[in-house]
């Protein structure tokens, strides 16, 4: 298929998801409920967020793992004492429309807490969990079985020591559902390769409309941006 003379590649099957990174941080506070709601009004299909486990085992949403000038770890602060909203509050936004949530975690404990929160909200099927530790993801896939959120490995090409084809094969072998990389890493050839192994291709950090369009033409299964209005503008310029 071609868009304006440019060869485009298909997604794995579902339409591409346009995700607002942190809500609408150019207009509202980053990772705020106001920003998440605004992103939906601006046309985002869901959100890309970062989750942390609080001292009382609640998943809270914030880009940074520490808070304040003393750089206290969010894991040492109860959720009620944190300015970061809980994941449960995000999952309640437009719940009847099932917006996708792609959440980054750093450890298995946080991953398990995300799964509990998603299950409690009836949102397991619209949750993608990203993690840079493939061993954590592989263990979770083995432990949790098929009724779980999608598990996405987040790492650059340079981390694929044996090359992308071997890496995609490994993801399939251990039951990890996809790969996340930033703009500048994905190509149409790479999305086709990962799709050949039935792995999702998650595109991150597209700053401009042009970049979002390129992501879609490459065949990524989701594209994220800090600017949700640009996501909607890019969608409007594509067939």
Residue ranges and their predicted role:
Residues 1-239:
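Phosphate-group recognition and catalysis centered on beta-loop-alpha active-site segments
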